[in-house]
Regions:
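ATP/NTP phosphate-donor binding region
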Residues: 1-62, 78, 101-118, 128-135
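Catalytic core of DAGKc-family lipid kinases
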Residues: 91-168
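Gly/Ser-rich helix-loop-strand patches that form or flank binding pockets
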Residues: 74-90
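A residue-level signal for conserved active-site and pocket-lining positions in enzyme catalytic cores
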Residues: 11, 64, 89, 141
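Glycine-rich beta-strand-to-loop/alpha-helix junction loops that act as flexible
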Residues: 40, 66-69
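Glycine-rich nucleotide phosphate-binding loop and flanking beta-alpha elements
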Residues: 43-44, 70-72, 149, 162
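Short glycine-rich anion-binding loops that position phosphate/pyrophosphate groups of nucleotides
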Residues: 13, 68-71, 91
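Short glycine/serine/threonine-rich phosphate/pyrophosphate-binding segments
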Residues: 17, 70-75
């Protein structure tokens, strides 16, 4: 995989994650890779942006998340659907979605550059209600209703199939 543009996403409010993001950014910059960081992470020669949504029009070769599942899901929701994400558990609680630890980053970057990897493609789930589309989800969507006195009617579409049914 040719790495030209990579964004590094750290866990909000975690100094451990922010410091790890700086380390990873420096490693990538030393390999002449263009790096984007998300504020407050700032690294010389990297391009800092205020938020992930500022990058959704840029074709990124890779996103690296440093945090827990929440950090990974935030990147997943805000980046283009074809952007691969390497997830590193740094300061996260469980890290169910994490692929590696920080100790493995050199090997992971080297493997990516040498194209000795496989991509696990995930389907995004998208929900809409009354014409308003919500951010994509990775594996589930929680539906709740305001008025509990009536049975709600749901319409679920998957590819060319549609199911419309009253459910509670």
């Amino acid at each position: 995989m040719k790495l030209n543009k990579v964004v590094i996403v750290s866990k909000f409010g975690s100094k451990i994650s922010e410091n790890a993001a700086k380390q990873v950014a420096k490693k990538l910059l030393s390999k002449k890779i263009n790096v984007y960081t998300i504020a407050p992470v700032e690294v010389d020669n990297a391009k800092q942006v205020e938020s992930l949504d500022k990058l959704n029009k840029i074709k990124l070769d890779l996103a690296i998340t440093l945090g827990g599942d929440g950090t990974t899901l935030r990147a997943f929701r805000n980046l283009r659907s074809e952007t691969p994400i390497l997830t590193i558990n740094v300061g996260g609680n469980r890290g169910i979605l994490s692929e590696i630890t920080l100790d493995d980053i050199d090997y992971a970057i080297s493997s990516i550059i040498k194209n000795k990897i496989w991509l696990d493609k995930r389907t995004r789930v998208v929900a809409s209600c009354n014409g308003k589309e919500f951010a994509p989800a990775l594996n589930e969507i929680y539906v709740n209703r305001k008025n509990l006195t009536k049975t709600a009617e749901f319409e679920i579409k998957f590819q060319s199939d549609t199911v419309k049914q009253k459910m509670d």
